[in-house]
C-alpha cells in the first residue's frame, strides 16, 4: 500500500496481511482501516487505486471473481470500497496496474508505449499505449498468457484450452516442459526432482545456469514461446519496451538473451526496430505506482 502526492511522489508505503477468511469479506475493510490508522482521511484523499488478481470490468469497477482472495463471484469492488470509505476508488487487474507502474516510474519510464509480461505461476500482462492502459470492450486486453503459441497443444491451461503461453512459459510451464523432455535427457541433475515430483522453476533455472542439458533445453524453449508471443504483440501495438517481470524473470540474461535471439528473426522488421526487451525494475512497488497513476488519470 502507498500514499502519493498529487504530483505522484511517494510519501509512504507499508504492507498489511491479506485476510481471506469469511469469503474475503474483511479485505476491503482492512485496507480502509489501514489507511485510517496511518492517519489518512477521506478529506485528504483524491482517490484510491486498487489492483486485484482477477478480470475486471474497468468501466464499472466490477471484479469477475478472484480465487486467490476467496472472492468466488462477481464483486463490485469500486462501489463497495467507496461505500465503506467515502473515498472515490478505481479498480483494475493487478498485472495491468503493474504495467502502468513500470511505464510511469520503472523500466519504461519516459516512453508512452510499453508492454509488460509477468512470468509467475501463470503469465499475466498489461499493454500501455500512449500512456494509457488498453482494456478492450470486455476488459480482457493484455491477457498475454492466453495467446496460442504451442501449436502442438500439449498441456492443459486453467482457462480450459491447450497451447496457451501460460502452459509453456510460466513456472508451471517450465515444469511441464522439464517433465515432457525428461525421457530424452536421462542423467540430468534434475532426475531425482522430476521423478519424485518436486521439480521447480528455480531448480530448472539453476540447472541451466550450470550447463545442464535439460535445463538449457527448457529455458530455450520457454524463450522461444515468449518470442512468438512478443512477435505477435509487436505487429499490433509496436511498443518501445517489452518489460519482463515476475518470479521466472529472475532467470535474468540466460532467459532474455534467448528471447531476443528468437524474437527478431520472426518479427516484422518495422515492428521490432528500436524495440528493447528489458527487465522490470520496481518489483512489488510497480502496483502502487500504477494504482496512483490510475487515480491521477481518471479521478482528477
Describe every region a protein language model picked out:
Residues 94, 120, 291:
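Active-site glycine-centered loops adjacent to acidic/histidine catalytic or metal-binding residues
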Residues 1-11, 116-130:
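Gly/Thr-rich phosphate-binding beta-strand-loop-beta motif of the actin/hexokinase/Hsp70
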Residues 140-144:
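Structural signature of FAD isoalloxazine-binding scaffolds in flavoprotein oxidoreductases
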Residues 1-47, 56-62, 78-87, 101-111, ...:
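ATP-binding/phosphotransfer module of carbohydrate and carboxylate kinases, centering on a glycine-rich
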Residues 89-93:
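General beta-strand structural signal in soluble alpha/beta enzymes
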Residues 61-74:
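A charged helix-plus-loop insertion that forms the helical arch/lid used to bind
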